[in-house]
Curated annotation (Swiss-Prot):
GO terms for biological process: regulation of nitrogen utilization. This is Bifunctional uridylyltransferase/uridylyl-removing enzyme. It catalyses: [protein-PII]-L-tyrosine + UTP = [protein-PII]-uridylyl-L-tyrosine + diphosphate; [protein-PII]-uridylyl-L-tyrosine + H2O = [protein-PII]-L-tyrosine + UMP + H(+). Residues 706-784, 816-892 form the ACT domain. Keywords: Hydrolase, Magnesium, Multifunctional enzyme, Nucleotidyltransferase, Repeat, Transferase. It holds the Pfam family GlnD_UR_UTase. GO terms for molecular function: [protein-PII] uridylyltransferase activity; phosphoric diester hydrolase activity. Modifies, by uridylylation and deuridylylation, the PII regulatory proteins (GlnB and homologs), in response to the nitrogen status of the cell that GlnD senses through the glutamine level. Under low glutamine levels, catalyzes the conversion of the PII proteins and UTP to PII-UMP and PPi, while under higher glutamine levels, GlnD hydrolyzes PII-UMP to PII and UMP (deuridylylation). Thus, controls uridylylation state and activity of the PII proteins, and plays an important role in the regulation of nitrogen assimilation and metabolism. Residues 1-342 are annotated as: Uridylyltransferase. Residues 343-705 are annotated as: Uridylyl-removing.
Amino acid sequence: MPQVDPELFDRGQFQAELALKASPIAAFKKAIRQAREVLDGRFRSGRDIRRLIEDRAWFVDNILQKAWEQFSWSEDADIALVAVGGYGRGELHPYSDIDLLILLDSADHEIFRDSIERFLTLLWDIGLEVGQSVRSVDECAEEARADLTVITNLMESRTIAGPERLRQRMLEVTSTAHMWPSKDFFLAKRAEQKARHHKYNDTEYNLEPNVKGSPGGLRDIQTILWVARRQYGTLNLRALAGEGFLVESENALLASSQEFLWKVRYALHMLAGRSEDRLLFDHQRSIATLLGFEGEDAKTSIESFMQQYYRVVMSIAQLSDLIIQHFEEVILAPEDEAPPQPINSRFQLHDGYIEARNDNVFRRTPFAMLEIFVLMAQQPEIKGVRADTIRLLRENRHLIDDDFRNDIRNTSLFIELFKCKIGIHRNLRRMNRYGILGRYLPEFGFIVGQMQHDLFHIYTVDAHTLNLIKHLRKLQYTQVSEKFPLASKLMAKLPKPELIYLAGLYHDIGKGRHGDHSEIGAVDAEAFCQRHQLPLWDSRLIVWLVQNHLVMSTTAQRKDLSDPQVIHDFAGIVEDETRLDYLYVLTVSDINATNPTLWNSWRASLLRQLYTETKRALRRGLENPVDREEQIRRTQSAALDILVRGGNDPDDVEQLWSQLGDDYFLRHTAGDVAWHSDAILQQPADGGPLVLIKETTQREFEGGTQIFIYAPDQHDFFAVTVAAMDQLNLNIHDARVITSSSQFTLDTYIVLDTEGESIGDNPVRVKKIREGLTEALRNPDDYPTIIQRRVPRQLKHFAFAPQVTISNDAQRPVTVLELSAPDRPGLLARIGGIFLEFDLSLQNAKIATLGERVEDVFFITDADNQPLSDPELCRRLQDAIVQQLSVTQEPGVELTRLTI
């Protein structure tokens, strides 16, 4: 800390200003304001961050000393003002907690009560937000013995004013000789760290990470230093290196990583104007600019900044693992430790952990850097890697070069890992953690820490990739197979499961490079297969899966699966059942590893339907596509059988069906046709709108709630319906609109609740939905008001111009309107209003929400049920949608251009 810094705080000038004023408050406030301006200016000019946070602590020391002097403490008074916690370390960010201990010799506080209260009031009046406690030395001991946080804070202390002897006595009575021996302290701190990591999802890669508390954050460094202080009396990184827990390169990396996070935290506090440790979207762009990250636009500068952030916290996490493991081996070492058990000539088992048998293992036999992970996968009883061996891996990973990558011993070992029955994900994660995976596969190293700046992808590309492999592995667990029955069944029967793991490893590896990441990844995957000498069939399957890993989800969510041509086209891409099985399992795991909230019961049922229909098409043969007329006949025959058995007159059924048209029977199953027809035939002529509600499947984790509406057609039918559903808090995922020749509309909607689940067996909720829709459709002139909900904070930071593409379908007389837009409350209701304004009829719709954006497809016609043909009308329609759906973006974020 500086001894003198008159620009930051001039003691003489401050004392003079105090003497001129009746009240000291104005002088203190002025000094605090000026100091903040000086320090912020120094930060913006690039001043050393360590010096900055120490300077701020020095300034606060001076202010507190001057405030303390305002009261009558005798020189030999048994009371001291002590800084504890982060402030006790001499580190203060702009709005960090200023933790104070007013330390007394005696538990009798009365003699000082009035002065203490007036002192704390003064601090409040001058704008210092402090956390304070008033304790005697004995009370400190009592509190510290019972509370891990208290003992931790007291370990980091400095006397600001008053006699130093009180603090020394406090340190003595709270030393390891009296409480919290280093073993107990270590176990408690390790448990505390695990709980904290779990709070932040056990990942460094949260979209809005906490720079202090998230894994790899500042608190992990502090945990290391706290344990070291309790064990060795050491409280800085350099001293820790001196104890042999860090080599010089690790010390330098940890110090530079800490300084980077200090810069981020300082900028966060400065921009937020308050204590803020969450790296919110609100601040990411400003901090990226403040710290000098540049890109083609705001989005790429944010992604560059966040990639640097993630790589820094990954480094901290790696070193934290190493040092905590080192502490465990030293502090928890049993007195009667068993001798190490040899595994082979290179490795041995030491207290349950694998370790190199000598320091030259990796230098003399570099292939052992892959072998160690294969051994752990083959012997799952191994708890992990000894600290010294982790360090040896880090020190020797530079030996992984092109010669290493092409060595058949290494390529064979890497493939062997993927053939292991268990431990694939765990050991790939270790390889990534220790920096081995990115060295062995440079293309993987490129995606480490790479964040895509959206709400759809909630993990970095490398974390998502490893999560996908984890999900593939979990499909073998009973509790997971219940939620993903088909995927689990198929995973168990894949002829070579290692191939889907390898395809998963490469499916997104092309991201971050210009071009189609599927095509780029396929090229990388092919090179990998050649280098690892995989058989031709295996290689072709892996490359095909990488190249086509998105096609199944895209088809299921954006195409009409009731259309035989859609199934035929998809089957033509897949070509055989083996590819279909692999692709289905990969798709399910990809969606769940991208963002768990994306997986819902309706997506599950769509993928199952596409899988089942495609399997039938492949078994039938692509040269024998489904005949539309034959499909209609089969549907009608099966439905008629159900209806007749239910007591319906076949003639009445035939008369109703003659009005419905072919599309109706192509889009609905025989069971649904029978359900609809039976209800329509029972409906009185003047009974008003008919609203039917049921679940689409009996499978627990699949399907949605189907709402069928039969009513006289009216111009505003779709607009009224979706507005009413919006008011009922229903999310529409599929819409099928049929108009009969008798001018009745038969609309089917698949809906989920706001949690992404079907309505289920909830009679009260079903009754409310039915009554709400019936009332809205009975009185369409009372057009339901679109609910004005606030656009969520996060969505505002991913605003982009809605993209609208309008084209005519070559196979059907409809116009296809494809919409990609920022999600917002009431979006479909707004679209319905626009269709009403432009006199358009909706024939079908596919609805998909992907994070912060929706990707919807609407099949529409004009008032004469014809495709749109007027270019000017299309242009005005596009403009209206863009204007209605644009979410106000953050300043400086450019909107994406409209594409026609």
